[in-house]
Structure formats: C-alpha cells, structure tokens
Amino acid sequence: MSEKKNKKEKLAEEIEQEELNSLDESVETVEEEATEETLTEEQAKILELENKLDEVENRYLRMQADFENVKKRHIADRDASQKYRSQSLAQDLLPALDSFEKALATTSDQEEVKQILKGMEMVYNQILVAFEKEGIEVIPAVGEQFDPNFHQAVMQDSDENAGSNEITAELQKGYKLKDRVIRPSMVKVNQ
C-alpha cells in the first residue's frame, strides 16, 4: 500500500510538475507575445516622437533663419536711414538754394546792394559747406554726356561744337546724396 501511495504521490507530483511546466511555458509565450506587442507599440511611439522632433527642429531652424533675415534687414534699414537722414532736409532747402543762386546772379552798382549780395553769398557758401559735410554734392552737367539717372532733358539743342548727346546748358542744378539722386539736373541736350 505504501508503494501504491508512493506511486500515486509521484504520479501526482509529476502531473503537478507537468502542469507547472505547461503553465510556465504558457506564461513565457504570453510574456513574449506581450513583449513583442509592447515593443511594436513602443517602436511606433518612438517613431512618432522622432517625427515630431524632426518637425519641431525644422520649424526652429526656419524661425531662426527668419529671425536672422529680419535682423539683417533691420540693420540694412537702419544703415540706410542713417546714411540718407539728411535727404528730406536737403530737398526742403534746394528751392531756397536756387533762390540764393538767382539773387547772386544779379548785379548792382549800389554799395548797399553789393553788401547785401556779399552777405547772401556767405550764407550760400555756408549752406554748400554744410551740404558737403553731409555728402550732398552737385551733379556735374554742362559738357557731360546725358545720363537719365542724373539728368532730366527738358530741351534739345543743335550745337555743332558739342558732341552728340552732350549737355550744352543746365537750367536747374541737380544734387545727389552719396549715391542717391535728390533732384536730377534739368538740362539742354545736344542732338
């Protein structure tokens, strides 16, 4: 009886061991499947996050480039503003300068008028010096070739002593501020 009992116990132990082994295998299989599913889900999440990161990095780089462009444009605008700051004042003073030139072109025998003209000439010269300090200069005209960038042709001439397209007379002086024309010269051009 004890042998039977031992056999039964051994058999029960073997069955129990087999069930445990079977359960272990099932658990391992389930764990492997779960791990594979988890890995696949995690890889998908990683891929999604990497794509989002790339997108954010690209947006950041574009924004940084835009910022640099705005910065450069601002510097260029500021430099141009500084360079041409006196343009508006010069444009406002040009009619007065023209009036000075017309007044100085008159002559008189009266001593008082000569003194006034001398004072006006001094003021006129001071304005020219101030213009020169700001980079404002007269556009050369008579004897030069006509250039539509600097001259405005208002009359034509037929002078045999002048070359073709040469300026023969200046009706109104032109001025430029550094490389920018403030007012073109009004000229008479030979055919």
UniProtKB/Swiss-Prot annotation:
Is Cytoplasm there in the keyword field?
Answer: yes
PROSITE patterns linked? GRPE
Q: Name one GO molecular function term.
A: adenyl-nucleotide exchange factor activity
**Spans of biased composition, class Acidic residues?**
14-40
- Swiss-Prot/TrEMBL keywords: Chaperone, Cytoplasm, Stress response
Where is this protein localized, as stated in its record? Cytoplasm
Query: Which residue ranges are recorded for the region named Disordered?
Result: 1-40
The Basic and acidic residues compositionally biased stretches are 1-13
* One GO BP annotation of this record: protein folding
Q: Kindly indicate whether the keyword NADP belongs to this entry.
A: no
Q: Which domain of life is it from?
A: Bacteria
Q: What is its main location?
A: cytoplasm
One term under GO cellular component:
cytoplasm
| InterPro entries (UniProt xref) | GrpE, GrpE_coiled_coil, GrpE_head
Family recorded in the similarity comment: Belongs to the GrpE family.
Q: What does this protein do?
A: Participates actively in the response to hyperosmotic and heat shock by preventing the aggregation of stress-denatured proteins, in association with DnaK and GrpE. It is the nucleotide exchange factor for DnaK and may function as a thermosensor. Unfolded proteins bind initially to DnaJ; upon interaction with the DnaJ-bound protein, DnaK hydrolyzes its bound ATP, resulting in the formation of a stable complex. GrpE releases ADP from DnaK; ATP binding to DnaK triggers the release of the substrate protein, thus completing the reaction cycle.
Self-association state and partner proteins as the record states? Homodimer.
Report the protein name in the record: Protein GrpE
Gene name in the database record:
grpE
